[in-house]
């Protein structure tokens, strides 16, 4: 997938950059959500009513007023209704700009993060900054649902194709949660692989699992940001499967000390940020 927009030409992603030595909020770079939503026809009205881009930031450090380095982990949730998503390399460079800057308290750092990310996203952003002692007790979890990956099928086409989902439902009405660890897409700018686990929770006519798995695997050579892939999956399932209720949730492996976990639903609230085995 290719988008033409001035905001993409200005991104630091894929370019050689220098790391800032002092706090600099201008390093954050937005990507308008409408770039993807225009192609899906959902710019003005989205088919999901709940959602966020859930980030975990593992590499946050700054100096206290005595010059002693401090470290923390942050949970960040960017509301799906924000005007922009935040480009990941710029987020990394922004976080690194804290490294040699002095702040009095955890709360001060958290306030800067919340304000700067909200301004960049042009929407609601929540930030929770945690000491490492808190994360020592965080479990590694599994996404609830039945894994559909162990199917005895042959795959020979890895080009994105939503038409795979044509006639993808059976008459039986179900309420189920399905999981696949085989989601792989590629960065829109750099083509680097993005690895994810996908959860689909729905109520409606039963979705054919073979067709669903083939559809998921068709993302393997597809170029889009994480958030855009999840919204595309949601829209394709609504178009072809027409469930009464639908949640699409992907948790991607981390890169540059950040993982991105987009969540979209038309019936349930954003979950807590809990990491998986590959995170």
UniProtKB/Swiss-Prot annotation:
**What's the protein called, per UniProt?**
NADPH-dependent 7-cyano-7-deazaguanine reductase
Reactions catalysed, as given in the entry: 7-aminomethyl-7-carbaguanine + 2 NADP(+) = 7-cyano-7-deazaguanine + 2 NADPH + 3 H(+)
Q: Where in the cell is it found?
A: Cytoplasm
Q: Where does substrate bind?
A: 86-88, 226-227
Catalytic residues identified in the record: 187 (thioimide intermediate), 194 (proton donor)
Query: Which family does the UniProt entry place this protein in?
Result: Belongs to the GTP cyclohydrolase I family. QueF type 2 subfamily.
The cross-references to InterPro entries, in alphabetical order and at most eight, read: GTP-CH-I_C/QueF, NADPH_dep_7-cyano-7-deazaG_red, QueF, QueF_N, QueF_type2
Any Gene Ontology CC annotation: cytoplasm
Which EC class is this protein assigned?
A: oxidoreductase
Query: How is this protein organized at the quaternary level?
Result: Homodimer.
Which EC number applies? Answer: 1.7.1.13
Instruction: Tell me the residue numbers annotated for binding NADPH.
Output: 88-89, 255-256
Supply the source organism for this entry: Pasteurella multocida (strain Pm70)
GO BP field: queuosine biosynthetic process; tRNA modification
Please give the function described in this protein's UniProt entry.
Catalyzes the NADPH-dependent reduction of 7-cyano-7-deazaguanine (preQ0) to 7-aminomethyl-7-deazaguanine (preQ1).
Q: Which GO terms describe its molecular function?
A: preQ1 synthase activity
**Which pathway?**
tRNA modification; tRNA-queuosine biosynthesis
Encoding gene per record: queF
Under Gene3D superfamilies, the record lists: 3.30.1130.10
Q: Which UniProt keywords apply?
A: Cytoplasm, NADP, Oxidoreductase, Queuosine biosynthesis
What HAMAP family does the annotation carry? QueF_type2
């Amino acid at each position: 997938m290719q988008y033409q927009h001035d905001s993409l030409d200005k991104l630091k992603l894929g370019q050689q950059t220098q790391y800032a030595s002092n706090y600099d909020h201008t390093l954050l770079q937005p990507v308008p959500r409408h770039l993807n939503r225009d192609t899906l026809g959902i710019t003005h009205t989205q088919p999901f009513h709940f959602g966020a881009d859930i980030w975990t930031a593992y590499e946050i450090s700054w100096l206290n007023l005595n010059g002693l380095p401090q470290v923390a982990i942050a949970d960040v949730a960017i509301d799906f209704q924000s005007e922009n998503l935040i480009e990941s390399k710029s987020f990394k460079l922004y976080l690194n700009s804290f490294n040699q800057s002095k702040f009095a308290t955890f709360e001060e750092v958290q306030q800067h993060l919340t304000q700067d990310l909200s301004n960049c996203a042009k929407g609601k952003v929540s930030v929770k900054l945690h000491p490492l002692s808190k994360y020592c007790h965080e479990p590694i979890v599994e996404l609830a649902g039945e894994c559909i990956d162990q199917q005895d099928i042959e795959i020979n086409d890895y080009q994105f194709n939503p038409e795979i989902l044509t006639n993808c439902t059976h008459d039986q009405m179900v309420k189920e949660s399905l999981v696949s660890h085989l989601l792989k897409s590629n960065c829109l700018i750099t083509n680097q692989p993005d690895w994810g686990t996908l959860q689909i929770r729905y109520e409606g006519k039963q979705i054919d699992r073979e067709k669903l798995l083939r559809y998921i695997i068709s993302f393997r050579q597809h170029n889009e940001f994480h958030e855009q892939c999840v919204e595309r999956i949601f829209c394709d399932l609504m178009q072809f499967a027409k469930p009464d209720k639908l949640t699409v949730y992907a948790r991607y492996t981390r890169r540059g000390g950040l993982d991105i976990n987009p969540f979209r639903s038309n019936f349930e609230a954003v979950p807590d940020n809990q990491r998986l085995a590959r995170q």
